[in-house]
A protein has these predicted regions:
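Bacterial N-terminal signal peptides
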Residues: 5-15
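Long, contiguous binding/interaction regions
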Residues: 20-121, 125-149
């Protein structure tokens, strides 16, 4: 009888456990407003700051060199973990941070890579765990609040 109980419990656990394949990545793409670059099971979205003209000691910085923001999702069961690094101007930090925190995401760092750059750019590290489409919508909304796409 005990063996039968364990077998039933194992079957219920296996049948109710959602897998990474259950995540509908097209919904995440739609929420992000772009398609991901996919490597194995990691879905990465780039946000290069091509709208900025940043100089450092008279040298123009190319977005691909130091102005490439991104977020990446990795499936964890039926949910996902998200991590990223967003490139922001000083005036964009508070509105983006407020939206991300309001949406349940974590800000793990804000720092500067390019001292003496003009305009000053800052790098906001974000992270979270949960429904990937919901987290993507929060990130997209936060970036839109700073007029970033």
């Amino acid at each position: 009888m005990r063996l039968l109980g364990l077998l039933i419990a194992a079957c219920v656990t296996i049948s109710s456990t959602a897998r990474a394949e259950d995540i509908v990545w097209s919904k995440v793409d739609d929420a992000m407003g772009r398609s991901a670059a996919v490597t194995q099971d990691v879905h990465r979205y780039g946000f290069p700051r091509t709208d900025l003209s940043v100089t450092l000691d008279g040298v123009t910085i190319k977005p691909s060199l130091a102005l490439g923001g991104w977020v990446a999702f990795k499936p964890m069961g039926s949910q996902a973990m998200v991590m990223g690094d967003l490139v922001l101007l000083e005036t964009e930090i508070n509105p983006v941070m407020a939206k991300l925190i309001e949406g349940g995401l974590d800000i793990t760092a804000i720092h500067n890579h390019l001292l003496r750059a003009s305009p000053a750019t800052f790098y906001m590290h974000v992270g979270g765990h949960g429904d990937p489409a919901k987290m993507a919508a929060v990130i997209h909304d936060a970036l839109r609040s700073a007029r970033l796409r």
